[in-house]
């Protein structure tokens, strides 16, 4: 199945999970909550982000494709819990007792703060540079700055210039 087709299929599953969790929250708090907008534009190692005032959830499409079942089971309720907490309690600690309570008491899930997904496919490439005491792994930007002569980087420990291995 093509990634776009897969993502459309997974979007339906995400919407079903959101509907299920919203029903649980509505029953628990005896009030209605509106369906959040969902976007698939988070990049890097983050699985998802909740935008409280916009009632919006942004998800990482690559991590969703690679870990669909666990992602829908854990990340979607995690981000929705942030929105529910904001609407019920206002501004509080992101993973504080209110959020943990929504995860445990409302969604019946363990309140995990960080995901455990393999992020090797979404991590940025690093370039190995050597000094006298260790190997440093520099970002693409720093590597290009060195290669184009825009920057020179030194080791903080031994004060020697870093050289590409």
Swiss-Prot record:
Residues reported in the UniProt entry to bind Zn(2+): 78, 82
Keywords, in A-Z order: Cytoplasm, Metal-binding, Zinc
Top-level taxon of the source organism: Bacteria
Gene3D superfamilies membership: Metalloproteases ('zincins'), catalytic domain
Annotated SprT-like domain residues: 26-162
MF terms in GO: zinc ion binding
One Pfam family it belongs to: SprT-like
List of catalytic residues: 79
GO cellular component: a single term: cytoplasm
Subcellular location(s) of the protein: Cytoplasm
GO biological process: response to stress
Cofactor note: Binds 1 zinc ion.
Chief location: cytoplasm
InterPro entries in alphabetical order: SprT-like_domain, Uncharacterised_SprT
Cofactor(s) for this UniProt protein: Zn(2+)
PANTHER family assigned to the protein according to its UniProt record, in alphabetical order: PROTEIN SPRT
Family listed: Belongs to the SprT family.
Designated name of the protein: Protein SprT
Organism: Pasteurella multocida (strain Pm70)
Originating gene: sprT
């Amino acid at each position: 199945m093509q990634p776009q087709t897969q993502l459309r299929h997974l979007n339906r599953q995400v919407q079903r999970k959101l509907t299920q969790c919203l029903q649980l929250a509505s029953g628990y708090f005896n009030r209605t909550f509106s369906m959040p907008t969902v976007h698939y534009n988070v990049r890097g190692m983050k699985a998802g982000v909740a935008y409280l005032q916009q009632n919006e959830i942004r998800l990482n499409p690559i991590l969703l494709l690679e870990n669909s079942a666990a992602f829908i089971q854990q990340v979607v309720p995690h981000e929705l819990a942030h929105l529910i907490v904001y609407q019920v309690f206002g501004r509080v600690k992101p993973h504080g007792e209110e959020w943990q309570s929504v995860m445990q008491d409302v969604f019946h899930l363990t309140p995990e703060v960080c995901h455990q997904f393999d992020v090797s496919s979404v991590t940025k490439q690093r370039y190995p540079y050597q000094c006298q005491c260790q190997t440093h792994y520099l970002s693409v930007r720093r590597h290009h700055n060195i290669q184009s002569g825009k920057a020179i980087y030194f080791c903080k420990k031994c004060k020697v210039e870093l050289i590409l291995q």
